[in-house]
């Protein structure tokens, strides 16, 4: 088991990684807890570690992120007499951590939050970083806060029954860290595909640990995205989000990001920021893990107009330019402000 202890803005944050990591909940035995969980998940494994708690299932899908639904969750905390010394647990995937994190951040200006992701994607990305968000007027994540959990528990037991396809979707984000932040992680991935696909305990623990440390190092340096550092976490996401939007969100996030990383690496090489061979390194590692490289391989209809429109509305747009992290070599990156018309041209080539 690995434990990462970090300090962010005078707040202590612990990340517990490994089989049996849920044992970290024992310290809540004497605490009052609200357990929010996805309806798709059996919460009994978590409940066995708690004593005084209420359980609140979260509806599936984007409806859970509606602001009115979030306020209903706030009301449940209020009606059950929760105060700032009590705890909220978010058990599930990105939707659950998004909405429950938002609720925790606004209730009494902040109540203790523990994230327990149940997918590889959640363990290496969604549960880390403190971003929360709910939808408003049919716009995704237009309301949100930066609010750090006191603890993140990544228990590998949740991954035992996860289909390999779900593991692959999470691996896209792991590969991202290796490509732009961590050559050691890239090398580890290059040598350990069989172990990772076999869900070897030590291999999964290693990639989750390295990914968690990589992401948290970026978050510590630029928690609120004001210094242009946290932008590195968006490698592959500008084109990737456009693909998601153009498919009416039928393409899974991990697959969209995989194609997005290929497109953005090609762009970086073509405009002269990436060393020769970077695109080959990107495509090789993604293909090793059986991730899609092109839009055609997604087996989904992409509305190019809708995808391009999503790029123009990207939150990274500033004064006609899009802030993008380009890989310069494996494990390194550079921020480049790309004219939006240039980006749209590259994107159209990639999406057709």
From Swiss-Prot:
Keywords: Amino-acid biosynthesis, Aromatic amino acid biosynthesis, Cobalt, Cytoplasm, Lyase, Metal-binding, NAD, Nucleotide-binding, Zinc
Reactions the enzyme catalyzes: 7-phospho-2-dehydro-3-deoxy-D-arabino-heptonate = 3-dehydroquinate + phosphate
One GO term (biological process): amino acid biosynthetic process
Record text on cofactor binding: Binds 1 divalent metal cation per subunit. Can use either Co(2+) or Zn(2+).
Lineage: superkingdom: Archaea
Cofactor annotation: NAD(+); Co(2+); Zn(2+)
Keyword Isomerase: no
Enzyme nomenclature, EC number: 4.2.3.4
Chief location bin: cytoplasm
Positions that bind Zn(2+): 173, 237, 253
Compartments where found: Cytoplasm
Listed InterPro entries: Dehydroquinate_synthase, DHQ_synth_AroB, DHQ_synth_fam, DHQS/DOIS_N, DHQS_C
GO cellular component assignments: cytoplasm
GO molecular function, one term: nucleotide binding
Positions with a binding annotation for NAD(+): 60-65, 118-119, 131, 140, 158-161
Pfam families found in the cross-reference section: DHQ_synthase, DHQS_C
Pathway(s) it belongs to: Metabolic intermediate biosynthesis; chorismate biosynthesis; chorismate from D-erythrose 4-phosphate and phosphoenolpyruvate: step 2/7
Role this protein plays: Catalyzes the conversion of 3-deoxy-D-arabino-heptulosonate 7-phosphate (DAHP) to dehydroquinate (DHQ).
NCBIfam families (UniProt xref): aroB
PANTHER family (UniProt xref): 3-DEHYDROQUINATE SYNTHASE
UniProt record similarity statement: Belongs to the sugar phosphate cyclases superfamily. Dehydroquinate synthase family.
Protein name, as recorded: 3-dehydroquinate synthase
